[in-house]
Structure formats: C-alpha cells, structure tokens
Amino acid sequence: MDLAAYWDSLPWQQRDLGGWTADSLAEGLAAFVAARHIAARQPAALRSLDILPGRAKDGSPEAHTLHLVPGEVVCIVGPTGSGKSRLLADIECLAQGDTPSRRRVLVDGSAPDPQWRFSGEARLVAQITQNMNFVMDLAVADFLHLHAESRALEDADEAVRRVLDAAVAMAGEPFGADTPLTQLSGGQSRALMIADAALLSPKPVVLIDEIENAGVDRGRALNLFVEKGKIVLLSTHDPLLALSGHRRLVIRNGAVARVIEASPAERECAQRLARFDRSLAGLREALRRGEPLDEAWSRLRF
C-alpha cells in the first residue's frame, strides 16, 4: 500500500482530527526519513573528553584535570557518599560550572553544543544504573528491532541477533528472543541494556554505576564497550573491576583526590584476582545446580 492509498483508507474523522493533508503528510514523512539517514551517516565522533577541576564539598579547589579518550576504561572508587555519583552526574550533563561541584566538561577541547546537553537524541552520554526495569510489554526481539530500525541500520535482524547473543552471554540465566521484557530478572535486564548500549547506541560515552551488583559477566561487559571504542567510566567497590581499568580515580570529600595509573604489578594482581573470581563463579554455579558444596570445592582452585 502506498502513502496515497493509506491516506484514502483512513476514516474521515481521523484525517480531520489529525490536522494533516495528503501533501503535508508526504512532506513530513520525507523529512523524517531524510533525518533518519542523516543521523545514521553522521554518528557522534568524539576524540576526547576533558573534565576540568571544580571544588570539593568544603569549597577547596580540586587538583586534577582529566583527559579521556575513546577505548579507555576509567574506574571511580571511594567510600559511599564520597562523591562518585556526583562525578558521573557532571559527566552525564556535560557540566559547565552549573552543578554543585563547579566542574566543567569539554568535548574535543571545547565547550559542548547545547543540544549535546539538553536534547535526548543528541546527547553524547549513556548511563546504566544499578536498578533497571522495563515497563514496555514487548518481547526482547521486538524491543531490539525497534531500536535497530530507529537507527536506520541496513540489517536490523543481524543487529538484533548480535545484541541478543551478547546479552545472553553476559547474563547469569539464559533468555530468548521471545521472552517478555517485563519477565526479565534484574541481571538479565542489565545485561540486555549493556549489550544494547555497546552495540546499538551511538553514544560515545558510557557511565556505569556498580556493575558488580548486576549479576552479569563483568569482564565481557567491559570488553564489549572497549571493542566499540567507547569511553567508559565505572563506579565500583569491586577490587577486580577497580584493577581492570586503565586508571582509577579516588574520590574523597566530593573531589578527585588521586589518579592512579594501572602498573604492571597491579596487572599481575588483577590476573590473580581474576583466577580467584572464576573459581568463585564456578562455586556459585555449582550451588545453583544443587551440587554438594564439598564436591564442587574439590574441583576448584582457590
């Protein structure tokens, strides 16, 4: 059915109340399609993100300027209430000295375009929080198809398959394309959104809040973002995750108190922790399967 036939098939009440004519509908559709293709050809190409120092909670000046580049993972550590979430919020809104911390965020060395701050579609930052639940009554595949089609991807089916495969690989419990979104567990929801943000979203900056509480494979999640060239900032209390980044920011009293570059010695510590973590994950899976603890323990290396 072409557009003219579709227009003629509508009840006169719907045509009248909509405020459209056949010509204006055709013009609006053409403009929408053109805008979709422009957005698909011109993704946000970010070269760097700079975070200029602001002030601590007591008003004292912050000491560190941060320079972030695509493919970099930066971990944010500090006690609860130290200001980790404030830093993430400043980056999310590309703060320009208009937040309590007085920080400024520069995009490619310059102040950001206002639409990158205030337009939902044009914003450069995606955030994955601790609590994520779906309210749409759709199957997983239908939801992913909607997102893929909105990005004007040439092969939406292939994009959906890649996102679903990545999400299932990260989740503790498998789920399928026909699973309703509202029936996903917290970990499954988080895995789906991580895969979606990495593989479908054009946002070049991703903020993640305490992924260790998500019930997902943390290593797979981080690797997915790095492979796609995202700038990743990760707030965490997990020692393995804290050692998995290129550097980590120590937050104290609302300010960046220290920047620690990952050293070879820390890389070795991370490898040891990773082996321990894999053994612990195996023990966890054995308990889920109902195996006796002593049998599982004898097979694992601690």
Model region roles, listed by residue range:
Residues 35-60:
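N-terminal pre-Walker A segment at the start of P-loop NTPase domains
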Residues 178-184:
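Conserved ABC ATPase signature
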Residues 80, 85:
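Walker A/P-loop
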